[in-house]
């Protein structure tokens, strides 16, 4: 399943410090049984929630378990909880997160916005199955920058660059 977290950093002057904290947060999440992979992204254009993290998880049960309650979720973000806004947490019923190379883009497509994409673009559609369910359906596509960057400004489409490589749990 894909656990997708979207947010805005409200204290942008502390971006480097936040990135360091978030990298440690990813490692902590990956230590929770059932978290398999994690990768962070940033929009290359203005967006309401410019930061996105895709986490691959085994099941929705993780979010009610003791390991997640002790190490994950908004209550375990310390001082950063109030410095992050426009926060959305959705769980999608897709088995694996895409592996987005550092030289590629992740394109997030809102339901009904795919008409702007070429028929040659493979969009992986996902249905929301848990947590906030702030959107019922959303698509993901991995594309080369030259192709994806031309979509900037298209309504319902966000173009994101990786902040770091995809991380995997040790188990």
Name what the model sees in each region.
Residues 1-171:
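Macromolecular interaction modules
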């Amino acid at each position: 399943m894909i656990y997708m977290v979207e947010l805005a950093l409200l204290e942008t002057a502390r971006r480097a410090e936040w990135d360091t904290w978030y990298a440690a947060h990813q490692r902590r999440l990956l230590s929770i049984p059932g978290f398999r992979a994690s990768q962070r992204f940033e929009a290359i254009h203005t967006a309401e929630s410019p930061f996105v993290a895709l986490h691959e998880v085994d099941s929705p049960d993780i979010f009610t378990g003791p390991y997640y309650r002790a190490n994950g979720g908004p209550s375990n973000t310390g001082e950063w909880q109030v410095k992050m806004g426009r926060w959305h947490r959705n769980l999608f019923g897709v088995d694996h997160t895409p592996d987005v190379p550092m030289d590629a883009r992740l394109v997030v497509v809102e339901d009904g916005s795919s008409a702007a994409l070429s028929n040659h673009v493979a969009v992986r559609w996902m249905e929301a199955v848990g947590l906030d369910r702030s959107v019922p359906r959303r698509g993901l596509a991995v594309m080369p920058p030259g192709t994806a960057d031309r979509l900037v400004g298209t309504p319902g489409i966000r173009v994101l660059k990786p902040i770091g490589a995809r991380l995997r749990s040790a188990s």
